[in-house]
Amino acid sequence: MTVIYQTTITRIGASATDALSDQMLITFREGAPADLEEYCFIHCHGELKGALHPGLQFSLGQHRYPVTAVGSVAEDNLRELGHVTLRFDGLNEAEFPGTVHVAGPVPDDIAPGSVLKFESVKE
């Protein structure tokens, strides 16, 4: 597999896990504005080495998910801000421009040190 993007969660905002009950996980790179950081999983920003698109594999820790849809600005947001909203609902069309949809259950064991990655499953 080819890694398109990889980063590590460094801290978790006080209200970040609240979105998990709505099947969402919101990320932002270190240095996010304080009012946003409270709601985000903060990570050390990695380099985006390819395009985000359906068919990639998203992984978080030991969990693996197929990417089913990518919003029109999700790739730019990830590249520039380290920001992406992940939805664990398997939709085939992005609900919002900044959303990446994946199929599978919401992870319940996210902690600082968890590795987040997008990978191409084709060589």
Swiss-Prot record:
Family matches, as Gene3D superfamilies: Phosphotransferase system, glucitol/sorbitol-specific IIA component
Gene Ontology terms describing biological process: phosphoenolpyruvate-dependent sugar phosphotransferase system
Residues making up the signal peptide according to the UniProt record: none
Location of this chain's protein in the cell: Cytoplasm
Domain PTS EIIA type-5: residue ranges: 1-116
Main localisation: cytoplasm
Sites of Phosphohistidine modification: H43
Swiss-Prot/TrEMBL keywords: Cytoplasm, Kinase, Phosphoprotein, Phosphotransferase system, Sugar transport, Transferase, Transport
Top-level taxon: Bacteria
Alphabetized PANTHER family for the sequence: PTS SYSTEM GLUCITOL/SORBITOL-SPECIFIC EIIA COMPONENT, PTS SYSTEM GLUCITOL_SORBITOL-SPECIFIC EIIA COMPONENT
NCBIfam families membership: gutA (TIGR00849), PRK10377.1 (NF007696)
Function: The phosphoenolpyruvate-dependent sugar phosphotransferase system (sugar PTS), a major carbohydrate active transport system, catalyzes the phosphorylation of incoming sugar substrates concomitantly with their translocation across the cell membrane. The enzyme II complex composed of SrlA, SrlB and SrlE is involved in glucitol/sorbitol transport.
Recorded domain comment: The EIIA domain is phosphorylated by phospho-HPr on a histidyl residue. Then, it transfers the phosphoryl group to the EIIB domain.
Name this polypeptide is given: PTS system glucitol/sorbitol-specific EIIA component
